[in-house]
Amino acid sequence: MRVYNCHFCSSPVYPGKGIMFVRNDSKEFRFCRSKCHKNFKMKRNPRKLRWTKAFRKAAGKEMVVDSTLAFSARRDVPVRYNRDLVEKTLEAMEKVEEIRLKRERAFYKNRMRGNKAAQLEEDRKLVEAHPELLREREVELRRMQEAGEDDDDEDMSEMEVSEEEESEEEREKVEIALKSKSKRKMRA
């Protein structure tokens, strides 16, 4: 079974799936779905569309240069069947796949390394720009603490609530949420 790659987005095209376009010079273009075929006909550049693998590789979001990627290259030269060779090839394929996955994980971790610091800096800027958000949060925390102190004073018997009462409260919350959503839709 031969699995082709989509000419536009580079995703796999399995037998019996996708569309094949054959140009006058007998060049074959295989597409995984109509979306890719339509974009190809519109002469769009796959490197500019964020959902294609070409974009991800061009933008540095996926590994481009790695020795494990060379093993998946297509080889058209037929080789005489040899049982030992097939067995070794299958074992090597598994090892190469494991190595590739490890390297991809390491590449992703390396790429995401600075995100925490950047997010923290963004949050800091947001708080500096809108200090009222912190005040609102402080008020909420005080209310929660006061409510917690009031609950401690009550008996444990009063704290126990039957399952029926809890389910009724949940239904009321859902109804309130649905009403607020419908109001938002009416406003928009």
Swiss-Prot record:
Signal sequence segment: none
Keywords noted in UniProt: Cytoplasm, Nucleus, Ribosome biogenesis
Localization terms from the record: Cytoplasm; Nucleus
A UniProt-annotated Pfam family: Ribosomal_L24e
Biased composition (Acidic residues): 147-169
A GO CC annotation given for this chain: cytoplasm
Annotated SMART domains: TRASH (SM00746)
GO biological process: ribosomal large subunit biogenesis
Region (Disordered): 140-188
Any one GO MF annotation of this record: structural constituent of ribosome
PROSITE patterns given in the database record: RIBOSOMAL_L24E
Family annotation (InterPro entries): L24e/L24_sf (IPR038630), Ribosomal_eL24 (IPR056366), Ribosomal_eL24-rel_N (IPR000988), Ribosomal_eL24_CS (IPR023442), TRASH_dom (IPR011017)
Function as written in the Swiss-Prot or TrEMBL entry: Involved in the biogenesis of the 60S ribosomal subunit. Ensures the docking of YALI0_B00990g/NOG1 to pre-60S particles. Activates and recruits ATPase AFG2 to cytoplasmic pre-60S ribosomal particles.
Family membership noted in the UniProt record: Belongs to the eukaryotic ribosomal protein eL24 family.
Subunit-level organization: Associated with nucleolar and cytoplasmic pre-60S particles. At the end of biogenesis it dissociates from cytoplasmic pre-60S particles and is likely to be exchanged for its ribosomal homolog, RPL24.
Name of the protein: Ribosome biogenesis protein RLP24
Gene that produces this protein: RLP24
